[in-house]
Amino acid sequence: MKSVLVVYSGGLDSYTLLNKALKEFDRIEAITFDYGQKHKKEIQYATQVCLELKIEHEVVNLDLENILSGSALVGGKKIPEGNYDKEQMKQTVVPNRNMIMISIAASLAIKNNLNTLWYAAHAGDHEIYPDCRPEFIESLAAVLQICDYHKINFQAPFMNYSKTDIVAEGLRMNLDFSKTWTCYVGDESPCLRCGSCLERKSAFELNNVQDPLR
């Protein structure tokens, strides 16, 4: 039986990946992390989707706000506005976040006897986020083959996809993107000004469709 644990934030990329997993695996589980992020609304979206899809879902409270608070996503810094710019968007890097999350996710996969671990890093993240780059993914994949008696196949299927490509993939699957949350600001509605919102807007425009959250 093919089995997978999907690291699922509640965002557009991991929502598409979760639905891709439903087509490719016999057994699917999901894990979501509350690490003190301002945009906790994404956790609500992840929980609701997993309920609808009847996917076993673990929400992990990391309670690491004091350690991770150097990032604008967690601490008191303002979320930067405007299109993705490397120096500006470095403020949204959460120190070693994906390493921490993937390590915990691997432990859950081992405990639940799942063979594969997926997460939704994509090509648009490479420039800004070190823990989304191919060398990180490849190195961690090697580690997860030797860190336990139960080997985990760690993969990032969207590693070479742009955000536009991911939206296109979701549209081919007829996904409802209103069930995703992208904005980094913790308001009730998307701010439409942060880099994450603007990247999402561009991805839908390049696919000639209206973002359902607009």
Locations of the language-model features?
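Short cysteine/histidine-rich metal-coordination sites, predominantly Zn2+-binding motifs
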Residues: 186-187, 208-214
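Local cysteine-cluster metal-coordination motifs and their immediate loop/turn environment
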Residues: 103, 179-202
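Short Fe-S-cluster ligation motifs
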Residues: 198, 204-211
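ATP-dependent adenylation/nucleotidyltransferase module used to activate substrates
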Residues: 1-174
